[in-house]
Design a protein with these regions (language model features):
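Short beta-strand->loop
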Residues: 119-128, 139-143, 235, 248, ...
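Extracellular/periplasmic bilobal clamshell ligand-binding domains
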Residues: 310-346
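A bilobed periplasmic-binding-protein/Venus flytrap-type ligand-binding module shared by bacterial periplasmic
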Residues: 150-157, 193-195, 265-280, 296
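Bacterial N-terminal signal peptides that target proteins for export
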Residues: 1-13
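Immediate post-signal peptide segment of exported/extracytoplasmic ligand-binding proteins
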Residues: 23-50, 68-69, 171-177
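Periplasmic-binding protein-like
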Residues: 175-185, 287-308
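Extracytoplasmic ligand-binding site segments that recognize negatively charged/polar headgroups
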Residues: 50-65, 76-93, 97-232
Length: 346
């Protein structure tokens, strides 16, 4: 009996440092069985969090209110375009003005924040449920949704049976003067260059397309979607899947299809390294990857959590690499402008 107690005592002595270390582990990387209990308790004490995001204004209540109702934690939202969110987060970090708790916008921009040490690493069990490529090795952000570029058409101008089946079909003369594109979609352009042959062959595809059929560039996906609805742009090459779907549900003469593989970029959630309300930010991070995933589907977004059915189930998707997008942004922006935008008469 005494020998057994001595063995138990020795075992506990060996375990003590590990247990102590676990108890002192920051919540963001804590992996104990009571992880969520700790996060929720600490978050409720903080009572609030500030979110910087690019999520559409009309979609925010659908995503934010359920979180507030479930946990009794108020979310203060500052919403702006991608560039403004990035600039504000970087400027405040540089000035050591720590106001933001969580950030949600494009993954390439999230990677830029990570490189400037604005975000903190997070370890979460939900990561294993996310689509491949959703979490970078440094764990400083996690993709929540995919913005999938699809093709939208005016149903009064274009017949469904006439739609192109492949990217190469866009070279058919029947599309002359009917194509539109968003003027800043170099990520889509980069991916399709690879899809249709890569390198000079891929670039030649776009040069031929512009020369033969022309492409009308428009700034803003919402504007491009509206121009499809009006019939001014019969076929748009790059709108996000949820935009024509939402317009269609309201009775607009628009529908969409996907040339495969469809190209997608991800939006992601990150927790600020110096968040004033770190636990609340972490809880919101978990919420966006779990409960909010079905809410995103209700808004026609494509979720990254593979346990949630996708509105684009069955469509082959090619996910852009956010790190490559960031590192090669200047190169592909120039190629896109030189090959498509400038030659399109912009």
């Amino acid at each position: 009996m005494m020998a057994s107690l001595r063995k138990l005592g020795g075992l506990l002595a060996l375990m003590a440092p590990a247990l102590a270390a676990l108890a002192q582990t920051p919540l963001a990387t804590y992996e104990g069985a009571d992880r969520m209990e700790r996060i929720v308790a600490a978050a409720k004490k903080e009572g609030t969090l500030t979110l910087y995001t690019t999520i559409a204004e009309k979609d925010l209540p659908t995503l934010i209110k359920p979180f507030e109702d479930k946990y009794g934690i108020k979310v203060k939202v500052w919403r702006a375009g991608t560039d403004k969110v990035l600039q504000r987060a970087l400027a405040e970090a540089a000035a050591n003005r720590n106001e933001v708790d969580a950030v949600h916008f494009g993954s390439p921009e999230m990677e830029a924040l990570a490189r400037e040490k604005v975000l903190q690493p997070v370890t979460s069990p939900v990561y294993k449920l996310l689509q491949p490529g959703s979490v970078p090795p440094h764990h400083q952000w996690a993709a929540t949704l995919l913005s999938v570029w699809v093709q939208a058409y005016n149903t009064k101008v274009v017949k469904k049976e006439d739609l192109p089946k492949t990217y190469q079909d866009l070279l058919d003369p029947k599309w002359k003067g009917k194509l539109g594109i968003e003027a800043k979609n170099q990520d889509w352009f980069q991916s399709v260059v690879e899809i249709v042959g890569g390198g000079d062959k891929g670039l030649k595809f776009f040069s031929d397309l512009v020369a033969k059929n022309g492409i009308s560039p428009r700034t803003g996906h919402t504007l491009l979607t509206n121009m499809v609805v009006s019939g001014e742009v019969p076929l748009a090459l790059t709108v996000y899947n949820y935009m024509p779907e939402q317009a269609k549900k309201k009775g607009a003469p628009i529908d969409w299809f996907a040339l495969e593989p469809a190209v997608a970029r991800s939006n992601a959630i990150g927790v600020a390294r110096k968040a004033p309300h770190p636990a609340a930010a972490l809880l919101f991070h978990e919420f966006m990857l779990t409960d909010a995933q079905t809410l995103m589907v209700s808004l026609d977004y494509v979720p990254t959590n593979t346990s949630v059915p996708s509105p684009l189930k069955g469509v082959r998707i090619m996910l852009t690499d956010p790190i490559r997008s960031l590192d090669e942004a200047e190169k592909w922006s120039k190629l896109f402008d030189d090959t498509v935008i400038k030659k399109a008469g912009r």
